[in-house]
Amino acid sequence: MRTIAIAAVFAAGFGAGILVAGQTQQAPSLPAERVTGIGGVFFKARDPKTLRTWYQEKLGIAIQEGAGFGLFLWRERQDSSREGTTVWGVFPETTKYFAPSAAPFMINYRVRNLEALLTQLRSAGVTVDGKVVEDFNGKFAWVVDPEGNKIELWEPKPGY
């Protein structure tokens, strides 16, 4: 009986703490333009071909023929008729694509309006690396986070 009473007091106190926390803490406001998802994960390898084969054979990541990367296909939650992709790629350890970052990885984030996001980031003092590049996949730009990691921002064309 005593155990039940202690558990009830603890549960009531915990519940009240959540209620109080919910009433006193504001969720941080989100910026107008923001990341909408992960567009890709890229990392360096000493032997990219062998590593890609390992991931394909052991974990089932289907590597695109001749491209050297894998694609994960999914549907948008708000509109299930719209498909999206997340790219998985292995780069040679000598690649300069991740520069100026010294990190052996780079994450690509999907965005809705790249130009507006870059304006917002520049206004906030974020280091923007170079100009916007556009190709058949969409628009790309790069920023550097406070720890020096290069981040790729991607506004995909429809169907990506």
Protein language model annotation of sequence segments:
Residues 78-80, 96-99, 132:
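Short secondary-structure boundary/capping segments
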Residues 32-36, 42-88, 123, 141:
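Core segments of cupin and vicinal oxygen chelate
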Residues 7-16:
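Bacterial N-terminal signal peptides
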Residues 2-3, 18-46, 65-67, 86, 93-160, ...:
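Vicinal oxygen chelate
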Residues 92-94, 155-156:
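Acetyl-CoA-dependent GNAT
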